[in-house]
Every structure is written in C-alpha cells, then in structure tokens.
Amino acid sequence: MEIINNSQKYDVIIVGSGAGGGMATKVLSDAGLKIALIEAGPYFDPANPDQMTQMKWPWESPRRGSGTTRAFGDFHMSYGDWKVEGEPYTIEKETSFRWWRSRMLGGRTNHWGRISLRFGPKDFKSKDYDGLGENWPISYDDIKPYYNKLDKLIGVFGTKENIFNEPDGFFLPPPKPRLHELFYIKGARKSGVTVIPSRLSILTKRINNTRGVCFYCGQCDRSCSAYADF
C-alpha cells in the first residue's frame, strides 16, 4: 500500500458526506474553515447524463429490463445495500437489523422518502405524558430554531395546521390533491378524521438559483435531475 503525502492543510477532516457529514461541511465551510471531506463512495450528480436514471425506460437498464438482485432495482439511485463488504457493524445472533448502507456522495440523503416532520413537545417529554421511557434533557423549544433554519435551507412543503404535537414550520405550497386523494379526503373528513398534506423536502417553488422545482414525475427514488428534492 502506498501512502501519498498531501501538502494541503485543513482545519477539519469530516468522514462521510451524508446528512450529518454534509451538513457539518456546509456549516463549517460557511464559517470560513477549510474542510477535507472524505467519502467511501464515488462522486454523484443526478443531472449528469452518465449517472442519471430519471425518466428512463426499463429496456434502458444495464439488463434491458430483466430481473436484478440489486436492492430496489437498477434505476434506484443509491449506491449500496443492506450489507456492504467490510462493514464493521455486527448484531446479536438470531436478531435482525436492516439499515441501508449508502456509499456515494450524499450518503443516505440519496435514499429516504423526504418526509420532514418535526418532533413535537410530547416527543421530547414522553414520560410526562404516558409514563414510558425517559424525557429528553432538551425540549422542543430548544430545537425549534434549528428546525426553522433547516426548513428554509432545504425547502419543505406543507400547510400550517396548528396541531400541538405536529408543529408548523416554514412551508412551501403543497401540491394540489389528485382526484383519488380528494375522495380520500372527503371520506376521512366525513368520518371526523383530520387530513393534512404531507410535509416533504421537495421544492414546489424556487428558493435559490441552484435548485429547480418539482415537475411531478414520481421518480424521487431515482434522484432528481432538477435538484428539487433534498
């Protein structure tokens, strides 16, 4: 094994470019620090024609649409698996724990449903409400300013509903309900069930000049070439 000396000097070295490492990189670099970001997987850009799988037909896959053992199919844009060779994590015998291991720029931010809900006051102090578990040493009010910053940074659509344990945030307009959803909403409200739009980190309007807006292709799992999802 060859060890290559690098003359560059950095203030911080961050291992992993996923949700934690990526956000730490942004915050520290915005503060003026020089960052070295180390990632086990390859560079990835969902708008790169050589990597993009969005809006492609099954016969355009490497296997021309035939079956694959790759988790979630050939067009799923998250390089990794439930188990990765060399992974150091272990579990007890006769137990099961499935956790997606993503090896690429962005890590598991390329593999999630973009559901962006806040923990509410009850979630931080559950023992006070049901006697189970332990309370967090912090409250929702302690975390609220950071939720607010994140909403504005990544863009989350939703509606303000004033539900105590589903705190409102800074929302973009939600998509209009489709016909079958209108039927669900009508039936639920007739039964006295509260129905609200989901809260997802998908842009329904522009928040900056580097990311586009969702065009409703329904292929978020293929990664967005318009950069409309986070």
Predicted regions and their residues:
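A short, basic/flexible loop-to-alpha-helix module at the beginning of a structural domain
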Residues: M1-K9
